[in-house]
């Protein structure tokens, strides 16, 4: 029997993240696992705006704001009896997810199948796909509710 002690769930604060979180919470409750919630700030989206400003100070402030937001999110969405580790890091999402999973010896990653849409998805690829290919542990990819496969 597989016993999960550490589960990682990347969060992007979307409604879809809430659905994905339900799966992660369910697994954590079943095995009394620690649930690691991770929010990755992709600073590449801010780089143009930050070039002329004090970059480190702004990055630190953004990280602090996102950590506060993640903790608020956790208290609204998760029961008190689940062990939680809330992490906010800066970097490339799939790289950070894999790095955190290795550093913390994560037993399973639970994440959504889609974050980006449209041209961003085409240009940058799927974070979930990259994580599934490179992760050191099993990855459960939760499909977005209401999405159906259609053959054109």
Predicted feature residues:
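Intrinsically disordered or low-complexity boundary/linker segments at protein termini
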Residues: 1-19, 80, 133-152
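Structural beta-alpha unit
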Residues: 2, 75-109, 146-152
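Acidic, proline/glycine-rich short linear motifs
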Residues: 39-68, 147-152
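Short beta->alpha linker loops
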Residues: 41, 65, 88-92, 114
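Gly/Ser-rich helix-loop-strand patches that form or flank binding pockets
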Residues: 100-150
């Amino acid at each position: 029997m597989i016993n999960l002690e550490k589960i990682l769930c990347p969060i992007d604060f979307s409604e879809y993240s809430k659905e994905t979180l339900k799966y992660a919470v369910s697994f954590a409750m079943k095995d009394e696992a620690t649930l690691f919630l991770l929010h990755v700030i992709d600073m590449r989206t801010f780089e143009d705006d930050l070039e002329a400003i004090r970059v480190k100070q702004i990055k630190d402030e953004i990280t602090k704001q996102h950590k506060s937001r993640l903790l608020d999110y956790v208290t609204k969405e998760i029961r008190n009896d689940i062990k939680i580790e809330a992490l906010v890091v800066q970097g490339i999402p799939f790289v950070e997810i894999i790095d955190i999973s290795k550093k913390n010896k994560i037993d399973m990653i639970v994440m959504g199948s889609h974050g980006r849409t449209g041209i961003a998805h085409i240009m940058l690829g799927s974070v979930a796909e990259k994580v599934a290919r490179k992760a050191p542990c099993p990855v459960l990819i939760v499909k977005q509710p209401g999405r159906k496969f259609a053959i054109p």
